[in-house]
Amino acid sequence: MEMVRAIDEAEQRLEGIASTTPLQPSIRLSEQYGATILIKREDMQAVRSFKIRGAYNKIASLSPDDRKRPVVCASAGNHAQGVAFACAHLGIGATIFMPRITPTQKIERVEHFGGELVEIRLVGDSYDESSAAAEEYCAQKQGIFVHPFDDLQTIAGQGTVGKEIFDATAGDVGMVIVPIGGGGLASGVASYIKGKNPAVVVVGAEPAGSPSMYESLKQGRIVELEEINTFIDGAAVRKTRQRTFDLCRRYVDRVVLLPEGKVCTTMIELYQNEGIITEPAGALALSALDDVAEEIRSKTVVCVLSGGNNDVLRYPEILERSLVYLGRKHYFIIEFAQKPGQLRQFVDDALGPTDDIVRFEYIKKTNRERGAALVGIELKDRADLEPLLKRMEQIQLNFRPLGSEELLYQYLV
């Protein structure tokens, strides 16, 4: 119950700073899953993510003496915005370390919220590398390190999301699905929800490409991943920490892993149907609904949409990954005879009525009888692939599909 009390105190500290975000019903998803699906809209915070809660609660709880020391943090973007906002509001200077992969939009937002009080340093290719540099710098300067998740005050601040969910539903909820990166949000929300009603099922949703919490819980110890996929940058963490690991092990019922293509599909669906722009990490919880579909029928389910700081310039890439995941986009290396009418035959005899060529380029210009071309084809349905392959064989095309492990494929997708 100590975390419950800490979260109650954090809520008072955050009054007038963090918004009480709405639980938005989704008619589309409720009909799809035969349940009442509510979306906790943390993208509607001033900094467009839940991170303002933990960052402000931590910094505002510093003693007068500690406030005189330099504040240091590391972040993939959203925590940095929360720290910048808090420091500007409290008049405290900060040095913020961010990975070099951080989207420009997030860097600019940090500059906007922090103003002259915040210095940004771009270091490392992942959160973990940036964090190591930040902690070393903090030790040199004898500063206060505001960790994005490995801190009880930060966790308590994030846990106010759980308090708002509980208060808004009077505890009458069957399941809460929370995204997991480092685990600060999940451990805070789960601590409060389980502390008030142990019967509520809490599910963590983590990227399949960076499953640090999943592997740690599976092995019963903190596991550091050798490699991670940083596409879902807001949740790309190589190693969780002891505090969040302990709380998640105690209060989170299980963790499901989501492939990036599934997350991209959720992002596209949210934009097309609800007009919601979310970042990849923000879509994790909603992406997990298929994994729990059978057990949530006729129940109330809350999915935490944790943030909306997404650069719209990423949407072409997001759509590409979604189409590949759905089996609707495929790439081939095709050898065409260098004679008139060969491409016309391919279009007329191989492509179906709803198949589209979305990319075509000769890999190498040649005077030989045959030339290889890279061809991208978009299908209306994944079931259209087999008929396409059969028609290509019938006209005796020499072709091969590009596999996901190939370097050229990774360049395209």
Where are these regions (language model features)?
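PLP-dependent amino-acid enzyme catalytic core
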Residues: 1-413
